[in-house]
Regions:
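C-terminal beta-strand-loop-alpha-helix "lid" module of Rossmann-like NAD(P)-dependent dehydrogenases
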Residues: 1-285
Length: 285
């Protein structure tokens, strides 16, 4: 059995760790509330934008979408992997990295590159895949404008023919304890074909076609922003859950160590009493 000093040191160490994990849990809980409010607020906008685009395109004849719907033979693929800059969030990053590798493996024989959003994904994926670009700073100021800049880079690469297909792998936020890994095709868009005519009393200027072609880049930027926002909220949810479990485990370990310490202390006192009694009896004899 370890001596009393060793047990006391372990109790002190575990207690310090417990204070850190508890503080991190509270910080993540506060950040989660803000991130959750942001993603909840933007989802109706993203859905309405998609609905508007579909309704307008349904009134048009033929195929609409221009370069963004160009269906080319897939030879070059870009995977956008959205992870975090920090760890201590359970399997949050690991799940995205695994899925990104699976998606890359599914394009065997083709050129597959990685666009890493988040330091953790870059650190791992660069060892086995070709990471062409890393974006770590967006989480410092997560705004639509900053996400739009990244989306514009991706659109430019596709339109220029650098890639025939672009996919996004990220964690979708459900609740604090649940994140779902999603693989979403970013480009090309599914061809927008005029179908059932949607009744509308709107007057369009300059034209429906031009409005649709303006909405498509806006929709793509919103799609990427939503994916990063989802991932950001999911990260804090995963970290809060992980730190909650770590705090519970540390509390349990500390209690076990205290029990062990008390037993060891009691045994030491008992031994001292026995030694004193034994010594007294020896003197009497």
């Amino acid at each position: 059995m370890a001596n009393l000093k060793e047990i006391r040191n372990r109790i002190t160490s575990v207690s310090s760790t417990m204070q850190i994990t508890s503080a991190m849990k509270m910080v993540s809980a506060a950040k989660l509330k803000k991130a959750q409010d942001a993603i909840t607020a933007m989802r109706p906008y993203a859905e309405k934008l998609t609905e508007l685009l579909q309704n307008l395109s349904a009134t048009l004849e033929g195929e609409v979408g221009g370069a963004f719907t160009a269906q080319r033979e897939v030879k070059k693929v870009l995977i956008v992997a959205v992870t975090s800059n920090r760890g201590l969030c359970g399997a949050f990053n690991t799940n995205v990295i695994k899925q990104a590798k699976l998606v890359a493996d599914s394009y065997a024989g083709k050129q597959v590159d990685i666009f890493a959003i988040g330091k953790k994904g870059n650190d791992v994926l660069r060892k086995t895949n070709n990471v062409i670009e890393v974006q770590n700073t967006i989480f410092d100021q997560l705004t639509f404008e900053n996400a739009s800049d990244i989306a514009q880079q991706l659109m430019d690469k596709f339109v220029a023919g650098d890639y025939d297909k672009i996919e996004i792998v990220y964690n979708e936020f459900k609740n604090a304890a649940t994140q779902i890994v999603r693989t979403q095709q970013f480009l090309p868009l599914a061809p927008i074909v005029g179908g059932e005519v949607v009744a509308s009393d709107y007057i369009f200027e300059p034209s429906k076609e031009e409005i649709v072609l303006t909405l498509i880049p806006k929709s793509l930027k919103t799609q990427l922003y939503k994916s990063i926002r989802d991932s950001f909220a999911a990260e804090h949810g995963a970290r809060m859950t992980a730190m909650h479990k770590a705090t519970d485990n540390a509390t349990e370990l500390r209690d076990q160590l205290k029990l062990t310490y008390n037993k060891a202390r009691q045994a030491a006192i008992t031994n001292e009493i026995l030694e004193i009694v034994g010594g007294a009896e020896a003197l009497n004899n």
